[in-house]
Regions:
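Hydrophobic face of amphipathic alpha-helices that form TPR/SEL1-like repeat modules
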Residues: 1-71
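Conserved residues at the C-terminal ends of beta-strands
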Residues: 156, 187, 245, 265, ...
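Conserved C-terminal structural/oligomerization subdomain of aldehyde/semialdehyde dehydrogenase
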Residues: 1-7, 11-18, 65-77, 81, ...
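Rossmann-like NAD(P) dinucleotide-binding subdomain of oxidoreductase/dehydrogenase enzymes
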Residues: 128, 147, 157-311, 504, ...
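Long amphipathic alpha-helix in the N-terminal Rossmann-like dinucleotide-binding domain
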Residues: 79-90, 94-95, 105-121, 132-161
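ALDH superfamily catalytic-core signature
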Residues: 228-233, 255-256, 261, 269-418, ...
Length: 543
């Protein structure tokens, strides 16, 4: 398509299906859930054209809500296999980067259509079974958000390529957005299928090749994502999938001289480790690696005395307990004025009592299980501490049971000390801690909200008075990269609320935005002169 100036289809957010009783999508999804539950998938490493299974290094993928149930078996990559995957990336990069950008874009637009069609129940079922998401949480993540990433990233890439410098008479200036020279290392979390697939595909769209390391606990849905990309026409080697011991994979990737970037979502501690290692290895790299990370959060809801109780309670419940609080944006701490607390407390307890926890294939459940035993133990540790502490009291929940699945009841803690650990530390589970502040000391409460935690990912305020809304927004300016007014702090939509935070929450490069894509290209400025100068002398030199 050398003789065409194309325009990509206008992006649109994928409509969310309801899965209400009697709908066609519910019937299809139930059938697919049964099919996948009865099948143990074999998930290989994907290295170029090779699908590699190593029976000596096999590991199981289990269902969090039924951990005796093996969903899949995967091969853990050796150091040699990681090296081979990187070499395959480097070999594929030149041809991939040389394609017209429209040809690269077409792969991801095709992938979006596949997800909207036949792969919708497949990737949703894999996300429900493998990550214990309800049908709604799987739909808004694995299908809708991932489709949105593909469509909007293409739109933003078109804007990048279209942005060109001015040209003076007698010359033509151009700007070329080249893919990074080398390979990008994509390190993925368990909690969002869409993020796990966007981390490698956003750089790939811009002409990069990518070493993709999904989390083993979300590997079933990541494998579906890989199959979608292959069917959409992604050439072998552009994205290679490796999984296994993170230390083995990262040690090879971070020591490689062709490391061009890291696209990361996960814990602050792991990202800090990656950053430090890159710093220690800086002299061996051919270029300065781009480091893009979305990390931890201790996300807040701050209520003013003018807030409406009903919407505040709903925001707290949904913000804290959807997907078991395992969203990096989940409401984990709240500051409630004393004047509202009796009504808010009553509403929280009454609403939490209605929440059903269990197998997400039972569509009446609001919550599933937390992801694994390690997460269960960590969250339970915070709950046990609150049960014994003089600085906190549990006002709802606190029950934990890992006998069948890793189930934790939604838990609400009232902190008597605003510096109590569950008001400051990331828990990543269905635990909401509330501090009740004196209405007359709202400025002190705002300072606590801003300074108590090192994170600054998401936050929300609830108030009716417009002057107060402006005041709170200013006071909490740097407390959150995504800030919500009279809404829960979760549920960012691609193309509407670009997502990311600062401080210890990451580099704030906003996934699903033009700013993120700019990190995966290196611009070359080209100046062509139509009237070359033939005399080295300047006019001022004339006698």
């Amino acid at each position: 398509m050398a003789n065409i100036r194309s325009t990509t289809p206008p992006p649109r957010n994928e409509p969310v299906l309801s899965y209400a009783p009697g709908t066609a999508e519910r019937t299809t999804l139930i059938s697919e859930l049964k099919r996948q539950a009865a099948t143990e998938e074999k998930i290989p490493l994907v290295i170029g054209t090779n699908k590699v299974m190593n029976t000596k290094a096999e590991h199981a993928v289990v269902s969090p809500h039924k951990h005796a149930h093996r969903l899949a078996t995967y091969s853990a990559a050796s150091a040699d296999e990681v090296q081979a995957a990187i070499q395959s990336n480097l070999e594929a990069r030149k041809e991939w980067a040389a394609l017209n950008w429209e040809d690269r874009a077409a792969v991801f637009l095709k992938a979006a259509e596949l997800l909207a069609g036949k792969y919708r129940p497949i990737i949703n079922a894999a996300t429900m079974l493998g990550q214990s998401k309800t049908s709604h949480q799987a739909e808004i993540d694995a299908t809708c958000e991932l489709i949105d990433f593909f469509r909007f990233n293409v739109h933003f890439a078109e804007r990048i390529y279209s942005e060109q410098p001015q040209s003076a008479p007698g010359m033509w200036n151009r700007s070329e957005a080249r893919g990074l020279e080398g390979f990008v290392y994509a390190v993925c979390p368990f909690n969002f299928t869409s993020i796990a697939v966007n981390l490698p595909t956003a750089p790939a769209l811009m002409g990069c090749s990518v070493l993709w390391k999904p989390a083993p606990t979300s590997l079933l849905s990541a494998w579906v994502g890989m199959q979608v990309l292959e069917e959409a026409g992604l050439p072998p080697g552009v994205i290679n999938l490796v999984v296994g011991d993170p230390a083995v994979i990262s040690s090879v990737a971070l020591a490689h001289p062709d490391l061009a970037g890291i696209h990361f979502t996960g814990s602050t501690g792991v990202f800090n480790m990656l950053w430090k290692t890159v710093g220690q290895n800086i002299d061996r790299y051919k270029t300065y690696p781009r480091l893009v990370g979305e990390t931890g959060g201790k996300d807040f809801i701050f209520a003013h005395p003018s807030a409406g109780v009903e919407e505040l309670v709903t925001g707290l419940i949904r913000g804290a307990f959807e997907f078991q609080g395992q969203k990096c944006s989940a409401a984990s701490r709240a500051y409630i004025p004393k004047s509202l607390w009796p009504a808010v407390k009553e509403g929280l307890v009454q609403t939490a009592e209605q929440i059903k926890v269990g197998d997400p294939t039972d569509f009446s459940n609001f919550m599933g299980a937390v992801i694994d035993q390690k997460a269960f133990n960590k969250i339970k540790g915070y709950i046990d501490d609150a049960k014994q502490s003089k600085d906190a009291r549990i006002i709802f929940g606190g029950d934990c049971d890992a006998s069948v699945g890793y189930f934790i009841q939604p838990t609400i803690i009232e902190a008597l000390d605003p510096h109590y650990r569950s008001m400051k530390e990331e828990i990543f589970g269905p635990v909401l801690t509330v501090y009740v502040y004196d209405d007359a000391k709202i400025d002190e409460a705002l300072t606590l909200c801003d300074t108590s935690s090192p994170y600054a990912l998401t936050g929300a305020i609830f108030a009716k008075d417009r002057r107060v809304i402006a005041q709170l927004t200013r006071a909490l300016e740097h407390s959150a990269g995504n800030f919500y007014i009279n809404d829960k702090p979760t549920g960012a939509v691609v193309g509407q609320q670009p997502f990311g935070g600062g401080r210890a929450s990451g580099t704030n490069d906003k996934a699903g935005s033009i700013w993120n894509l700019l990190r995966w290209c290196s611009h070359r400025t080209i100046k062509e002169t139509f009237h070359p100068i033939t005399d080295f002398r300047y006019p001022y030199m004339q006698s």
